[in-house]
Curated annotation (Swiss-Prot):
It comes from Arabidopsis thaliana. One of its GO terms (cellular component) is extracellular space. This is Protein GOLVEN 7. InterPro entries: RGF3 (IPR038804). The modification Hydroxyproline is found at P107.
Amino acid sequence: MTTLSKILCVLIILLLCFSFRYSLHEDGNQQSSRDFVSTAKAIKYGDVMKKMIRGRKLMMASGEKEEAETKMKRGNRETERNSSKSVEEDGLVAYTADYWRAKHHPPKNN
């Protein structure tokens, strides 16, 4: 009997802790008391940032065309930037993949 009462007590405490984790706001929506929102909810409501900066590159978070970023206007013509990467940016990359092409240097002692 004491084991059953202990288990019941622990379950009640966990239920209360879980219920106090959420708070009702003025508009009646039940939201978490934490400061962050999941990405799925942010995309659903449109609160996601359009651009995010990662390293030295400006990446588009909304899936816009990247072709506009890789083209430059020089005078009257458009030229594409030559990239030395051997891995395309359109999918997952194996952890052991070569990320850069081999660079061919002239012989050292000729």
